[in-house]
Amino acid sequence: IVSGEIRSVTADIILKKCEEALEESSQPSLKKVINLTGTVLHTNFGRALLPRKTIEEVGDKYANPVTLEYDISKGKRGDRDDHIVGLIKELTNAEDATIVNNNAAAVFLTLNSLAQKGEVVVSRSELVEIGGSFRIPDIMRKAGCRLVEVGTTSRTHLEDFEDAITEKTAMVMRVHWSNFKITGFTASVDQETLADLCKKRKIPFIEDLG
């Protein structure tokens, strides 16, 4: 009325405006975008895309009840991990496996389950913070672990890990650097070497792949 667009307010006008407002407010927040950033697996754009066939199969399955946590052969409740654990064990030669929805959850649960109240040895150069305020020292504290830093920001050697391992050591951890690098006069210990050390000392070794 003030702008002059309408002369009077009727029930039809009110209903139409309410319908428009409701439609606008109920639009999904996820929008399709075209990724022209040059980063193929962009962390803010959903990372790896699912194949169309996979999407169609998932949609078909979840349009109906499925055996998510039910073992038909035994006629009783099952475990949702059963659908994928066998494949992971076959691919990795692991004794067992479980799945969570992101890497941060995997790191936290691993630390909390295997190293709670114990010490976790990590190279000082790997105390990173990545997107979403995922900070290694904070995650360890919340998981109930005690962080033991070894080496320096630029150089960490095998003997640094060897000297830090005690009867209180619950785990040795290696952390992915994500989106930065340390260059120049540097040194680090590779995955295989740390794994061999932990086997000899009979303690778990994990690698956060980011």
Q: Where are each of the predicted segments found?
A:
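Residues that form generic nucleotide/phosphate-binding pockets
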Residues: 17, 21, 25, 57, ...
